[in-house]
Amino acid sequence: MISVLFFINFSKLAYNNHSLEIYSGICMAYSLFQSQAVKFAKNFAIFTACFCFFLSANAKTVEKVASPAKLCTYFYDFNFHDPQLKKPEVRQAIKAMVFSNRIKYENGEINYHILPKSLQVETESHWSPIAVEQLLIQSGIRSKSPLYLNILFENQKPHNVIGRQISRVLAQSDLIRVNPQAVKKSELIVQRNKGNYQLIRSEQCVEKPNVMLFLARFASTHSENLNGYANAEVDKLLVKLQTKKLNNAKRVALIQQLIEILEQDVAILPLYEFSK
């Protein structure tokens, strides 16, 4: 189109200088218009690309924010197959020593209960000062026949830091001999399955804030119950909660009863809760 205009412009030059000016003006105006149009098209394309990128990035951000964080509990499992740890007095003594020293964990909130705080129901507190040495002696543990604790945890932070803190606390007793073992996560799983531990680092995470997702593992027949914990009353209550239609008041009452039994049993050694 530009070449045509220049051709017309050149032919008019021989006839009329005024025509030359008119056609030159038309040509310059068109060229300017086309130049601006090209710039606009380029700018519009860039703007469109940036806007689409912004929408895409923003959509991903919204999706990430909308995804609920997993609610997790951080604890140590006892090996209930161990003849000493089967005794509730021994587990109570260990619990008393660890809880009284408030093991630090920067990324978690201290929680010495079975359930995360957001899911807890009111239960009667049976906690009272405990004479640790007396409990151990009642269990037949003496300085000449001490309690041996093989404590397993991962060899990465924060697990190794927490594991060594727990080990130092328990080693303060003359009746306890501690063997802390920091291992790879894969090795931790292997030793858990073999039962080669007295205390082992554990955690449980759920995507939905459901009480039963945290409690089901305490059933003696549950696939995740690898430490040998078994209580007939706990099994009975879990069956009721999972199979019977209950109103809210009855359900809460059964959960309260179940939690009290688990905490009296010292079924686990709870330490923290966190989200990820």
Pin down the residues of each PLM region:
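Short, positively charged and aromatic/hydrophobic N-terminal segments
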Residues: N9-N16, E21-Y23
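Intrinsically disordered, low-complexity segments enriched in serine/proline and basic residues
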Residues: I8, A37-F40, F44-C50
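Periplasmic binding protein-like
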Residues: A171-F218
